[in-house]
Amino acid sequence: MHSASGAAVAALAKGAEILKTIIGEAEIALGGIRWKAEYETDEKVFCEEVLAPLLRRMGFLAVRYTHGVRENGRDFTFSELTSFGVMRHYGLQAKAGDVSGGVNSAIDELIGQADDAFKMPYYEIASTEPRYISTFIVAISGRFTSNAKDKIVQKVPRGVWGSLLFLDRELILELIGRYWAVS
């Protein structure tokens, strides 16, 4: 008797998970995304539910969520074909919440990640050709407080200043409005 009720509970739980996924996909397909408080605290959810689909909707190619031990400062890698007919490669580091410019902040970590992202190659699936990024993006689900962006820019080599982009919640929501709309 208990095994039958356990199986029923497991089946209901699986069904609930499937429905949750379907509802999420329907919301996205209908052109909207509800910003969740969870995005401010859970980097993985922010990456999977916001950044990955947004990058794809923006038309980037080979969008890969690479978060983990061998990410080399990049939670995402992706590319685009430029007007000159060459591929431009990007690296994106995501953070949940705000980034501040205060003492003992996440800035030194971000600077190290940017340095790794530019210096270390990455490899596409089934390719032995190393790829190097030309643009590094810091995307956060909160906002950059005080002088955070200025500190990052001032601490990286001057040659990469024009290759750094900063996306906060406000700009991400603007991009969602532009690229996530129902066609």
Name each model feature, range by range.
Residues 1-183:
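Mixed-charge (Asp/Glu-Lys/Arg
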